[in-house]
């Protein structure tokens, strides 16, 4: 794929089986200032995909993006640190309020990673943010595991149904 809007690129990554697109996406995202904390233990975590969706796609697009970012920033990536405590329906057609309810308590830190997360600056990676409900639910789990701080990076921003254009 050459050119294309951010939305087209994300759609190709997620739904057309083009994980290699994570490379140029990570190149763009890696230029962001202020994400890494100098002197802190920085680590990247990806938003876990529902098992059925990952089986269907063959990969987790957020994990692929996180791995590419980790290589550029030269920090650890813990793509299996966060897990879904339950499967959640797709959020594409949900309102902001429905999204909050949909992902509430849907994530936790895998026990093997809790000690590593304690006191660390964790950077959550996802392909797109819409309302922030998923990011907030993941951050809640990361703070519960003892993270010192949590930041997030995404490649794109989407509008939720009913959002006014900006």
Where are the language model's segments positioned?
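Extended interfacial segments that mediate partner engagement and assembly in macromolecular machines
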Residues: 1-72, 92
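PRPP/pyrophosphate-binding module of the type I phosphoribosyltransferase fold
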Residues: 67, 71, 76, 80-166
């Amino acid at each position: 794929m050459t050119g294309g809007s951010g939305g087209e690129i994300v759609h190709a990554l997620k739904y057309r089986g083009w994980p290699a697109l994570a490379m140029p996406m990570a190149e763009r995202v890696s230029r962001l200032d202020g994400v890494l904390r100098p002197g802190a233990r920085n680590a990247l975590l990806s938003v876990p995909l529902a098992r059925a969706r990952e089986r269907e796609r063959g990969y987790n697009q957020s994990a692929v993006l996180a791995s590419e970012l980790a290589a550029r920033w030269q920090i650890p990536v813990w793509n299996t640190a966060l897990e879904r405590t339950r499967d959640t329906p797709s959020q594409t057609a949900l309102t902001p309020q429905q999204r909050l309810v949909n992902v509430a308590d849907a994530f936790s830190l895998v026990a093997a990673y809790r000690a590593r997360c304690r006191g660390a600056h964790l950077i959550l990676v996802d392909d797109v943010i819409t309302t922030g409900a998923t990011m907030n639910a993941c951050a809640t789990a990361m703070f519960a595991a003892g993270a010192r701080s949590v930041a997030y990076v995404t490649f794109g921003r989407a509008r939720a149904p009913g959002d006014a254009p900006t």
